Amino acid sequence: MLIPHHLLEAETLTRLIEDFVTREGTDNGEETPLESRVLRVRQALERGEALILFEPDSQQCQLVAKRDVPKEWLD
């Protein structure tokens, strides 16, 4: 299930983004400040390039690129 980012409380959204950008595998080899990485993801959400996916079975949220979401989920 896709969750519109604007429906989350600001603090919840920030924590979700921070969790995403600090995970293993998201490091691009450069020393980019946390604030910059959070801002980039927040802007991608605002532009609709990234989405929040909620998995009911696991009760987990994850950030995904829109291009990776099945088209039928976007309708």
Curated annotation (Swiss-Prot):
Pfam families: UPF0270
HAMAP family: UPF0270 (MF_00690)
UniProt organism field: Azotobacter vinelandii (strain DJ / ATCC BAA-1303)
InterPro entries: UPF0270, YehU-like_sf
Coiled-coil portions: none
Family label: Belongs to the UPF0270 family.
Protein name: UPF0270 protein Avin_35000
Gene3D superfamilies to which the protein is assigned, alphabetical: YehU-like (1.10.10.610)
Domain of life: Bacteria
